Amino acid sequence: MYREDYRRFSEKAPELLPEYYFWQTYRTDPKAPFIFGKVRDSRTTYIEKSVAGIDMNHGVYIDVFPLDFYPEKRFSQWKLELQKKIYKHQIATVYQVKRCFLGRGLNTLNRFLGYQHRTAKTLAKYEKAIADYSGKRSDIVCNHGNWQGKLEYSPQWHYGEGHWATFEGLKVRVPENYDAYLTQKYGDWRSDLPEEEKQGHHFYTICDLHRSYADYRKQ
């Protein structure tokens, strides 16, 4: 959702959501290392390997990505991309993932500087960089929270005013020009993937739909 709506939802989430749904951001859960929000079901457990060691809400979730406009000027774009790289490396100190040689070196340096203890402060700076920069904005809309880089940058007309569609029995709003949006991001998205490419990128240590993550944390 656009940043303005995202901020409005963040303010209203506690009164809009049932008590067992937790709106997780770096503000509501300071150790959560995400530049976007998650609606977590606190009655359940989904502990991903990369963040298993973090003391935060680990309920089953859906991601909520804020959409921001890209700067118009090339220099501002370059500056923003540099800031993003720096902040991502600083936040990465809390993740349990395999890294290349350079990544291990940067991680060691950032941990020496104590960034593993400053997740919320780093994310606040990161959010300000992508959402509150000065200067003119272009008509390019960015999802900075997802992992596919500039494939997440789309012309505003892709989103348009939105389009109502049915997803697993639910009426949801999708991009107005969803075909153009999906084609830019995935190519021939209507064709089935080869079997060897049908692999997820989320790996968990515990998944339990009937027991709260808080119970596992006590063990």
Question: Residue spans of the language-model regions?
Answer:
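Non-catalytic, alpha-helical, charged scaffold/linker segments
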Residues: 88-89
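Conserved catalytic core of two-metal-ion nucleotidyltransferases
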Residues: 3-72, 92-101, 107-187, 192-219
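A short secondary-structure junction signal
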Residues: 73-79
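Short, His- and charge-rich active-site/binding loops that engage polyanionic ligands
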Residues: 83
